[in-house]
Amino acid sequence: MSLNRSEKEAVISDVTGLAAKAQTLVMAEYRGITVADMTKLRSTARSNGVSLSVLKNTLARRAVTGSGFEIVSDLMTGPLIYGFSEDAVAAARVVADFAKTNVKLVIRGGAYGGKALDVNGVKQLASIPSKEVLLAQLLGLMQSPISRTARVLAAIAEKKGAGVADAPVEAAAEAVAA
């Protein structure tokens, strides 16, 4: 189905808006994927805040012109699905996880932070934990020395207090027995 000029301009404007908000772009070749698998991929992407689009490559190139994703415009050939996400790792994770279970989805590359990513770069980006997990790990690291110190102090207090606290109990037990 061919698009007229106004429809093409609308698509370019929509994708330009996505690119302006997004931190990451991932591109994958989807040749041979069934409709059911593509529907699952789209559903997973939506639930993770990733916008997946099948676009004409010329429209995609025009849409990313002037953005940080322009550096990968030379990779925009063949039947591609484009994943944009505001979260730095979400698009890479969704596409890489799906590609593990469906060999027909082939990651072509992507862009993050104004830099082009090859296939391995996208996979490395996908392996990074989410922001929430990283913050939880950081908080755990910060709390670890404090909780360790508290446990040591409690053990010292228990050790010193054990002899003092047991003496009145023993004296009371002897008084009751006598």
Curated annotation (Swiss-Prot):
Coiled coil: none annotated. SUPFAM superfamilies: Ribosomal protein L10-like (SSF160369). It comes from the Bacteria. Gene3D superfamilies: 3.30.70.1730, 6.10.250.290. Transmembrane segments: none annotated. The keyword rRNA-binding applies. GO terms for cellular component: large ribosomal subunit. Keywords: Ribonucleoprotein, Ribosomal protein, RNA-binding, rRNA-binding. GO terms for biological process: translation. GO terms for molecular function: large ribosomal subunit rRNA binding; structural constituent of ribosome. The keyword rRNA-binding applies. InterPro entries: Ribosomal_uL10, Ribosomal_uL10-like_sf, Ribosomal_uL10_bac, Ribosomal_uL10_bac_type, Ribosomal_uL10_CS_bac. Forms part of the ribosomal stalk, playing a central role in the interaction of the ribosome with GTP-bound translation factors. Belongs to the universal ribosomal protein uL10 family. Part of the ribosomal stalk of the 50S ribosomal subunit. The N-terminus interacts with L11 and the large rRNA to form the base of the stalk. The C-terminus forms an elongated spine to which L12 dimers bind in a sequential fashion forming a multimeric L10(L12)X complex. This is Large ribosomal subunit protein uL10. It comes from Albidiferax ferrireducens (strain ATCC BAA-621 / DSM 15236 / T118). The lineage of its organism: Bacteria, Pseudomonadati, Pseudomonadota, Betaproteobacteria, Burkholderiales.
